[in-house]
Amino acid sequence: MKASEEEYRLNFFIKNDFKRKICKSCKTPFWTRDEKKEYCSDIPCTDYYFFDINIKSQPLTVKEAREKFLSFFEKRGHTRISPKPVLARWREDLYLTIASIVDFQPHVTSGLVPPPANPLVVSQPSIRLEDIDNVGITFGRHLTTFEMAAHHAFNYPDHYVYWKEETTAYATEFFTKELGIPEEELNFKESWWEGGGNAGPCLEVTVGGLELATLVFMQYKITDNGNYTPLKLKIVDTGYGVERIAWITQKTPSAFHAIYGNLVYKFFNKIGVAYIDETLLKVASRFAGKIDPDNPDTIKIHRQMVSKELGIDIKAVEEELDRAAKVFQILDHTKTIMLMLADGLVPSNSGEGYLGRLVIRRALKVLRLLKSDVRLYELVKEQIDFWKEDFPQVLKNKDYILDAVELEQQRFEKILEKVPSIASTLARKSEITTEDLIQVYDSNGIPPDLLEEELKKKSVKFELPRNFYALVAKRHQTSTIKSAYDKVKLPKDMLEYITALQPTEKLYYKDQYMRSFEGKVLGVYKNYLILDKTTFYPEGGGQLGDTGLIIDEKSSKRYEVIDTQKVNDVIVHILKEEPSTIKVGDNVRGEINWERRYRLMRHHTVTHVILAAAKKVLGEHVWQAGAEKTPEKGRLDITHHKTLTEEEVKLIENYANSVISDRRQVKPLEMNRMEAEMKYGVSIYEGGVPNSATIRLLEIKDWDIESCGGTHVSNTSEIGAVKIINVERIQDGVIRLEYVAGPALVDYIRETQAKIVEASKIIGTSPDQLTSRLRRILNEIEEKNNLIIQYRRIIETELLNNLKPYEINGNKIYIIEGLGDEEENKEILRKLTSTDNTIAISISDNRLQIATSKNMRVDKIVEELLKGGGKGGGKGTFANVILNSKKSKEEIIEIVRKSL
């Protein structure tokens, strides 16, 4: 959609002598006080010429630029609020905080929840990976991490705050009065913004080739069919670039110098790259506005312009600028890595962890291309020391950040050992596509740049996409939200039936210990029953739905409830049979299976206890990745970068049992969503993100507070005790803890004791002697195994000395009877085929192992063998085959003869 000219024809512009002009280059309308201006002052229409503008402000660091912006708006009636983490954990559809408006999506922008203040001002650290491949090349125009300083106003139908006129006036005052930019240099470029399902006209503020801010006026919702409908809530969504404000006041040759100061020189030194010639850098930066990274020709033209201007050989210019760009990339990426990990990201192969690993591996790749020996964690440590006052969480989580980065580098180095074999596989393809390269990266973690050299050795050419990492990041930057209907275990016809029913009153929130109740029937459909109120808890938050009885008060007939589910606010009781005596309007009595429910309450409560204990032992990066509470046990999946040690498990268990022994109060709270976020942070959403203005929190006194809709005990002492019974790494970056509490712990102890007694009987000893007896048995087994190995070596030697080969066309074919051990057979076959033109086959019933010498291939032999029926295969010089029927030596020799 394109807005009309009237959307931008503001009284502010008219009163302050701004003229509407059309840019001579891009043909975009813009507003300026300079009547002679022909260009919009944005690149690529102009070069960077802000270096030449007389700006009255003293040079500002990033910290000073941030504070100047926040203070300016604070003095003008805006409430300063704290930024959110760079991980958007209050959103289920987005992994990273890409802009300040994300702080308020979807619940504030939809009108469900009021903002924390109105108007407000914030400086939000943000991460965008869509430009990751462009970082460094444009001298700081593109970054993966940046601070979006923003003032927001939320205009309701009955409450106007401010809109376009005031927003434009604020921007003009800030840039001209606060920063001292000459009024004639300030331009407002007409544009259109869309994002997150919303849209609106916007003005881009440009000065000297640099876009300093975007003023968005969010006023439309984009419908599913692509139409635009007006929003009831009209939002001022601004974004000022803190780093660009610092850059324009410092006038450094790159934004990296303005952002990182002396850290730039330190990185060049640590990485082992000579610092770029200052004159070359200044000239290259001035012409950098001409670079469109998506068009490689513009990069080439830029380098030619620099070469011509300085009279330097083009190759020397390219080499020096390429090296500098790589160092700038590492500066940018290490800050992004630091912020991601400080806010709790655990590198992995999925979700937000995938994006973190992508940035880490890109930084490692660049270091490798620069042939640098510096460890990545050393550079991240420099970033922590530099930013620790701006972002206190980076210092608090320093140990985890550095440990995770070093572990990732070790894993990456191990992965690179696969490069030759992966390159060999790719080399066999007739054409290597971008999709092939993405598949290799996703499956093996190998960047295509590092495959390039290996493929060149094989004379294989392929086109490496310039935006490779952006393409990969785009595929992984969002997650799919399931609707309430997708999450429940109910048939479609049942979901349609309940749409007209009123919400169910949740008695289990009024009294979690209520065991029975009376309710009125609102709906009966097959074996599904809906009441006006219930104390049956529906499955949710990892807690199983309640079971029990529904009693028809007229006939006294009892119906077993086998499960309870919820769709939106309607609770559905699933009965074992259709309730033939119950109809709509009847009164019924409900009784929950209390023993089962109480077990679930204990396991649900102890899950909160263990999660907080894990954070205390392992670090603040621990985040709930999943949970399940059954009557038999609890299960908690947590994010962590390493396998847990026995000592760590013991500490988690000890902390949990200490909290149980402390008899701490467990109390549910209801709070306004934004108030809860401001008070406790987004960690309250560990168990999921509820879609409501008011959220239910569970507080364990002085231990944990988290959003949770489950049922819990009222005091930790009711849990009794907890035992962690299993710990395993279920996927990259995720550890699963299983545990039992209360009566389930007693059951576990009984079962374990029974197994110990049974094991003791089997080996003929008493339970107290079981350990020592097992050690003796294991020692005996080890001794016997050593004897077996010795005997096998004797047999192997005898076999190799006495075995006579068959001769076929100058090839030797050995046939041996299998020894019953596949690895032993494989070793013998390997020795037999150590010389050229040799085939060795081990036969064990209808199973064959086939090996050939290095100058032969096994494929044709396997193909010939399988003609008679069977399965199997292999590659290169070894294969396993299972035939449909056993064959004699003579038959196998004949088959081999045919294959040769």
From Swiss-Prot:
NCBIfam families: A-tRNA_syn_arch, alaS. Belongs to the class-II aminoacyl-tRNA synthetase family. Its cofactor is Zn(2+). PROSITE patterns: AA_TRNA_LIGASE_II_ALA (PS50860). Its EC number is 6.1.1.7. It is found in: Cytoplasm. Binds 1 zinc ion per subunit. It comes from the Archaea. Zn(2+) binds at H604, H608, C708, H712. SUPFAM superfamilies: Class II aaRS and biotin synthetases, Putative anticodon-binding domain of alanyl-tRNA synthetase (AlaRS), ThrRS/AlaRS common domain, Translation proteins. One of its GO terms (molecular function) is zinc ion binding. Pfam families: tRNA-synt_2c, tRNA_SAD. This is Alanine--tRNA ligase. Catalyzes the attachment of alanine to tRNA(Ala) in a two-step reaction: alanine is first activated by ATP to form Ala-AMP and then transferred to the acceptor end of tRNA(Ala). Also edits incorrectly charged Ser-tRNA(Ala) and Gly-tRNA(Ala) via its editing domain. One of its GO terms (cellular component) is cytoplasm. Consists of three domains; the N-terminal catalytic domain, the editing domain and the C-terminal C-Ala domain. The editing domain removes incorrectly charged amino acids, while the C-Ala domain, along with tRNA(Ala), serves as a bridge to cooperatively bring together the editing and aminoacylation centers thus stimulating deacylation of misacylated tRNAs. Keywords: Aminoacyl-tRNA synthetase, ATP-binding, Cytoplasm, Ligase, Metal-binding, Nucleotide-binding, Protein biosynthesis, RNA-binding, tRNA-binding, Zinc.
